[in-house]
């Protein structure tokens, strides 16, 4: 069986940057998981004494708080600073972009529409920057019964599928006087999605590696499954079932933006050793 990695996969710029920030700030705590990969979180705690705190109110004056790549709500960031917490911001620059857009466009009187998952930490943060509120949707049908202003600003969660975002934009544009569409899907997300789309069309089994809570990994899996019915989303080599590979001839592999190289290599090695 041939094993091939997608042309683009794994750690993105924002995650690499955040990991470096965390490693440079030993004996600190991240507010929320720095990235959606439990194994990498465990490594940071073991090797660099970087802990994890889920409640921003638990940080005391003088404590060091590393902000997760997904960002946090504006009011919580303000509280941390007001309480003299040493804030180290590891928010991905691609995430701060929609935050800034939401704030600026909301203050200019635009209705803010966010394409994404309302429960995702990135969207909780982005939404908080819309001074006069924002609406979060995942599909065009959710817009049908909404009474919206004539001036709309549209942003997307950085890890969503481009084609799904276009469906939202294409619904709004003919119906409203002014629709400002901002491309806030990050380059790495787009490149990884295109790469998995390409390789999944020629593979008879696909392995997508990443955290179960990772939005961008879920999107990669969705694209892969569209083209290759035998697609599997795993977190590491321990999730592999080697019966999957029986009589397969081409195994394609991709990984989410928060999946470190060492986990990817462990998966590749495990598959190679099984055939």
Swiss-Prot record:
Cofactor annotation: [4Fe-4S] cluster
Annotated [4Fe-4S] cluster binding sites: 12, 92, 186
Pfam families: LYTB (PF02401)
Binding site for (2E)-4-hydroxy-3-methylbut-2-enyl diphosphate: 36, 70, 120, 158, 214-216, 258
Record: active site: 122 (proton donor)
GO annotation terms (biological process): dimethylallyl diphosphate biosynthetic process; isopentenyl diphosphate biosynthetic process, methylerythritol 4-phosphate pathway; terpenoid biosynthetic process
EC numbers: 1.17.7.4
Catalytic activity: isopentenyl diphosphate + 2 oxidized [2Fe-2S]-[ferredoxin] + H2O = (2E)-4-hydroxy-3-methylbut-2-enyl diphosphate + 2 reduced [2Fe-2S]-[ferredoxin] + 2 H(+); dimethylallyl diphosphate + 2 oxidized [2Fe-2S]-[ferredoxin] + H2O = (2E)-4-hydroxy-3-methylbut-2-enyl diphosphate + 2 reduced [2Fe-2S]-[ferredoxin] + 2 H(+)
Alphabetically ordered keywords of this record: 4Fe-4S, Iron, Iron-sulfur, Isoprene biosynthesis, Metal-binding, Oxidoreductase
Residues annotated as binding dimethylallyl diphosphate: 36, 70, 120, 214-216, 258
Pathway: Isoprenoid biosynthesis; dimethylallyl diphosphate biosynthesis; dimethylallyl diphosphate from (2E)-4-hydroxy-3-methylbutenyl diphosphate: step 1/1; Isoprenoid biosynthesis; isopentenyl diphosphate biosynthesis via DXP pathway; isopentenyl diphosphate from 1-deoxy-D-xylulose 5-phosphate: step 6/6
Top enzyme class: oxidoreductase
Disulphide-bonded residues: none
Cofactor info, note text: Binds 1 [4Fe-4S] cluster per subunit.
Molecular function in Gene Ontology: 4 iron, 4 sulfur cluster binding; 4-hydroxy-3-methylbut-2-enyl diphosphate reductase activity; metal ion binding
Protein residues bound to isopentenyl diphosphate: 36, 70, 120, 214-216, 258
Family: Belongs to the IspH family.
Function text: Catalyzes the conversion of 1-hydroxy-2-methyl-2-(E)-butenyl 4-diphosphate (HMBPP) into a mixture of isopentenyl diphosphate (IPP) and dimethylallyl diphosphate (DMAPP). Acts in the terminal step of the DOXP/MEP pathway for isoprenoid precursor biosynthesis.
Protein name, entry field: 4-hydroxy-3-methylbut-2-enyl diphosphate reductase
Organism: Sulfurimonas denitrificans (strain ATCC 33889 / DSM 1251) (Thiomicrospira denitrificans (strain ATCC 33889 / DSM 1251))
């Amino acid at each position: 069986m041939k094993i091939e990695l997608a042309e683009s996969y794994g750690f993105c710029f924002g995650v690499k940057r955040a990991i470096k920030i965390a490693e440079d700030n030993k004996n600190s705590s991240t507010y929320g998981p720095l990235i959606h990969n439990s194994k990498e979180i465990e490594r940071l705690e073991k090797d660099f004494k970087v802990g994890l705190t889920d409640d921003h109110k638990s940080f005391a004056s003088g404590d060091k708080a590393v902000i997760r790549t997904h960002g946090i709500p504006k009011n919580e960031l303000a509280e941390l600073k007001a309480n003299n917490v040493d804030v180290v911001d590891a928010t991905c620059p691609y995430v701060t972009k929609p935050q800034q857009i939401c704030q600026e466009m909301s203050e200019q009187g635009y209705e803010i529409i966010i394409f994404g998952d309302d429960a995702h930490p990135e969207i909780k943060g982005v939404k908080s920057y819309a001074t006069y509120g924002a609406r979060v949707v995942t599909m065009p049908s959710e817009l049908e019964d909404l009474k919206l202003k004539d001036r709309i600003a549209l942003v997307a969660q950085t890890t969503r599928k481009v084609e799904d975002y276009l469906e939202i934009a294409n619904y709004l544009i003919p119906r409203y006087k002014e629709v400002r569409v901002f491309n806030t899907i990050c380059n790495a997300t787009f490149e990884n999605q295109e790469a998995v789309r390409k390789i999944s069309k020629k593979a008879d089994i696909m392995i997508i590696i990443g955290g179960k809570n990772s939005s961008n990994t879920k999107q990669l899996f969705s694209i892969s499954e569209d083209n290759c019915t035998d697609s599997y989303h795993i977190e590491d080599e321990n999730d592999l079932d080697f019966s999957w590979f029986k009589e397969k001839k081409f195994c394609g592999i991709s990984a989410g933006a928060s999946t470190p190289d060492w986990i990817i290599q462990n998966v590749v090695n495990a598959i190679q050793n099984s055939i």
